[in-house]
Amino acid sequence: MSKDNIRQYSAPVYDGIENAPARSMMRAVGFQDKDFNRPFIGIASTWANVTPCNMHIDGLAREAEHGVNQASGKGIIFNTITISDGISNGTEGMKYSLVSREIIADSIEAVIGCQGYDGVIAIGGCDKNMPGCIMGLARLNRPGLFIYGGTIQPGEGHTDMISVFEAVGQYAKGEINAIQVKQIEEVALPGPGSCGGMYTANTMASAIEALGMSLPGSSAQDAISEEKRQDCHRAGEAVMNLLRLDIRPRDIMTKAAFENAIKVVIALGGSTNAVLHLIAMAHTAEVKLDLDDFVRIGQETPVVADLRPSGKYLMSELIKIGGIQPLMKRMLERGMLDGSCLTVTGKTLAENLAEVEDYPADQQIILPFEQPVKKDSHLVILKGNLSPTGAVAKITGKEGLYFEGPARVFEGEEGAMRGILDGEVQEGEVVVIRGEGPKGGPGMREMLKPTSAIIGKGLGQSVALITDGRFSGGSHGFVIGHVTPEAYEGGPIGLVENGDKISINAETREITLHISNEEMSLRRAKWQKPEPKYKSGALAKFAKLAAGADKGAVTDLNLDV
């Protein structure tokens, strides 16, 4: 059997008399003699019926397998997990969301490493699938690429998942009744695909395309479409080309490529989760990326997309005018992107964009750089005595650039949700939700229910929210998350008391707790570290291993090896 260099990993596992048992196992699943001479390509599928984001991915995986086989490889489908943030948000189950990113990366690494696959295609739909898949690819660094599962269609009346969350707040305010909430619930999500705005899934898919780790156009295709089917088929050809050229993920995932990804995320008005995930992905690829990079890049990159949650349009509408490729070409022509970066096509970013046509002249989704939504980044990195090592704010400018008010403190999301819905939270206040960090939560839950309730109750312009947890890509308003150090680690957010004045200045990038140093020291002396909430299982392991949010909350940063 062939032992050429494109079978570098499969040959030691399957070739030779000594490996007859391994071949026998594979014959049981349908392999024939000819298949053992082909490179083995693992296809990591996140298919599941637990969420519309992933319910169609089994078909996409089979299409990718067909593409691999037609390109003279041998595709082998295996599954990893997915969870649904949209279902678990606001519950104890949401603590597993960020944990699932690590489990996805671990499981892809484990299967590819164990089974001796020469290349990898990973297919993801829901939020944590994207970074988890990329981290899995980067760890073993075998030729591979990512396929995005695609976007859901809009619901009736231009609704989407966030419409349902905000309907709950409208109900609490008395603006709509229970029947109307149910009517929105029934029509907001019409079928397969990831949540339809520039929320976390579409943000990360766009970032991965800009990074060069998915095929051109992959991030902006409807979940059920001929374009997505072809994307999967072409991925089979692409991974075989990467094998022949010996191009590996870390050849593509350079510092310049990550900076391209950050710029595209900002231009699109993408999710705060991109900060967390891009830092984690870069760590796995052994690229130094930190919050200071987001500050530097953010000062020179405007927001030009009028997309939900802060804007008007849905991803399906951006798809109709050309997706993100014309935007990237505009950015390249302005010198904003590094066109020399290598991509999974085997070509540079500039080569991929050479023939891309501009958007239609009458479109209103992507604005001119001369008339941006915001002249600099909406992802504002804040530091100050409340967050010495950094926090991430999502401020488009529609909320204003400065907020000051008395603190309304809640120990965890559930208490905050009750306080908002019951009218405890008043205009002008700064809601502080703590004990939700990577270690303290554990799991760094998203505060989508509280932010949606604030918006639904009409407080979006008059209340700010600060947390050591995260936000959904669907959150909007004056929101600051990823506060570090987190409360569980003794961070200042754990010392805030009701009524303390807090100020947030997006222009100077400062977040300040207005108490004296002496008072801060007195409170710190009284502070006691909470007991871990979990003593065994996945959440306990994550709490023990997770780095701070400013380090991507990865679980392999401080291992004593």
UniProtKB/Swiss-Prot annotation:
Cofactor(s), names only, from the UniProt record: [2Fe-2S] cluster; Mg(2+)
Residues reported to bind Mg(2+): 85, 127-128, 446
Enzyme Commission number(s) of this protein: 4.2.1.9
Cofactor note text: Binds 1 [2Fe-2S] cluster per subunit. This cluster acts as a Lewis acid cofactor.
Disulfide bond residue pairs: none
Active site (UniProt): 472
Alphabetical GO biological process terms: isoleucine biosynthetic process; L-valine biosynthetic process
Any one GO molecular-function label of the UniProt entry: dihydroxy-acid dehydratase activity
Reaction(s) this enzyme catalyzes, per UniProt: (2R)-2,3-dihydroxy-3-methylbutanoate = 3-methyl-2-oxobutanoate + H2O; (2R,3R)-2,3-dihydroxy-3-methylpentanoate = (S)-3-methyl-2-oxopentanoate + H2O
Modified sites of kind N6-carboxylysine: 128
Pathway: Amino-acid biosynthesis; L-isoleucine biosynthesis; L-isoleucine from 2-oxobutanoate: step 3/4; Amino-acid biosynthesis; L-valine biosynthesis; L-valine from pyruvate: step 3/4
Residues reported in the UniProt entry to bind [2Fe-2S] cluster: 53, 126, 195
Transmembrane segments: none
Keywords: 2Fe-2S, Amino-acid biosynthesis, Branched-chain amino acid biosynthesis, Iron, Iron-sulfur, Lyase, Magnesium, Metal-binding
Family membership: Belongs to the IlvD/Edd family.
Oligomer status and interactors: Homodimer.
Protein name (database record): Dihydroxy-acid dehydratase 2
Species the sequence originates in: Acinetobacter baylyi (strain ATCC 33305 / BD413 / ADP1)
Organism placement in taxonomy: Bacteria, Pseudomonadati, Pseudomonadota, Gammaproteobacteria, Moraxellales
